[in-house]
Amino acid sequence: MKLIAKTRILNTLVFSAAGK
């Protein structure tokens, strides 16, 4: 479950960077 949480955070960071 922790791996999913970490992936979710990383995905959010990537999405934020892409949006920027």
Curated annotation (Swiss-Prot):
The lineage of its organism: Bacteria, Bacillati, Bacillota, Bacilli, Bacillales. This is 26 kDa protein. Induction: Under acid-stress, this protein is expressed at a higher level in wild-type B.cereus than in the acid-sensitive mutant strain NB1. It comes from the Bacteria. It comes from Bacillus cereus.
